[in-house]
């Protein structure tokens, strides 16, 4: 649900799968959650155009022209520490929060280490936004700025 809204999306889905059997099983999972326009599968990315995302280094962010600095981590991570002037929309909600984003200009995105960010940035690009990813994400910025990184609290056993 991070990258696909079945109510708005009309493009057919092609799955990346190891075999026809695996593709069929994956299609069944999609159908169970209301996504029924899976039309085929591929077994390799060979021959496909791959996008190399634009990046901005943490030390260049202060002089880099952008309209919005978007933190796609969860609310708890954001509350524990974030980049100055950042706006928080969890990566899993970006597709449903497009009305909160500027129509023009460049959006710089980041998460904790870069994984969720790459997904959220890809979603925004698919919707026509100009997106630049913060190299190293939050942890990269922390390393350059000297700020204390946010760490996840240990899980405790429930009684």
List each language-model region with its residue ranges.
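Rhodanese-like catalytic fold shared by cysteine-dependent sulfurtransferases
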Residues: 1-159
């Amino acid at each position: 649900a991070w990258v696909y809204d079945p109510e708005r999306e009309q493009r057919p889905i092609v799955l990346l799968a190891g075999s026809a059997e695996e593709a069929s099983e994956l299609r069944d999972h999609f159908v169970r959650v209301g996504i029924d326009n899976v039309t085929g599968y591929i077994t390799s990315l060979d021959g496909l155009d791959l996008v190399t995302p634009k990046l901005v280094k943490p030390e260049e962010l202060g002089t880099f022209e952008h309209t919005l600095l978007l933190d796609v981590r969860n609310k708890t991570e954001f509350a524990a520490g974030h980049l100055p002037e950042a706006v928080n929309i969890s990566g899993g909600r970006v597709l449903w929060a497009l009305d909160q984003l500027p129509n023009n200009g460049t959006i710089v995105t980041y998460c904790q280490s870069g994984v969720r960010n790459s997904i959220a940035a890809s979603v925004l690009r698919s919707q026509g936004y100009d997106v630049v990813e913060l190299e190293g994400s939050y942890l990269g910025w922390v390393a350059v700025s000297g700020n204390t990184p946010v760490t996840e609290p240990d899980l405790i056993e429930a009684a």
